[in-house]
């Protein structure tokens, strides 16, 4: 988004960048500027797209976008911290004025336990009687011992570090010493 390069008809177009996983930044040798974009290295010397001597396409996109959103308000805040931002926390803080989080999640009407036909028994805030049957069915399906008084901790997520799996792994041994059961559902990296 360089006003010296864009045609007049494109100058009024506004852009929104959605950050799903800041770990994937599009880092390349600066030679890519010529190979892919037909630009000389001098074009990037203003610091917009270079980071640690490499082209960083995500950094450039964040700086040039009119608005940046993340997949949740929590993730938007996490992106301003070193732990989650994978070295782009300074850029994210600098662009905080245009950063927001858009919450995604389940459809609470479709997956309402009071009416869901796909669970063992229905329940609601006013009538919790079916909840124990659902817990027993989950324990049966996952091969856990059916222990009615032991809490089940559930995690449904992509199984990658930026979703917190590394944090769970750090404390997993301690968690398993507690009177609890853990159910994890998701796809992710083989490690």
List the predicted regions and their residue ranges.
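Catalytic cores of nucleotide-sugar-dependent glycosyltransferases that transfer UDP/GDP/TDP-activated
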Residues: 1-191
């Amino acid at each position: 988004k360089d006003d010296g390069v864009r045609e007049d008809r494109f100058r009024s177009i506004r852009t929104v960048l959605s950050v799903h996983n800041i770990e994937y930044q599009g880092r390349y040798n600066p030679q890519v500027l010529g190979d892919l974009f037909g630009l000389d290295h001098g074009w990037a010397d203003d610091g917009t797209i270079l980071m640690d001597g490499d082209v960083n396409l995500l950094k450039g996109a964040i700086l040039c976008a009119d608005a940046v959103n993340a997949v949740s308000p929590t993730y938007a805040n996490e992106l301003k911290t070193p732990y989650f931002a994978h070295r782009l926390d300074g850029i994210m803080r600098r662009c905080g004025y245009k950063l927001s989080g858009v919450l995604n999640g389940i459809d609470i009407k479709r997956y309402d336990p009071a009416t869901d036909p796909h669970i063992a028994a229905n329940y609601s805030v006013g009538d919790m009687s079916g909840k124990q049957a659902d817990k027993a069915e989950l324990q049966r399906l996952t091969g856990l011992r059916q222990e009615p008084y032991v809490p089940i901790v559930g995690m449904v997520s992509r199984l990658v570090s930026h979703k917190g799996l590394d944090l769970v792994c750090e404390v997993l041994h301690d968690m398993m010493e507690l009177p609890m059961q853990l159910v994890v559902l998701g796809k992710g990296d083989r490690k």
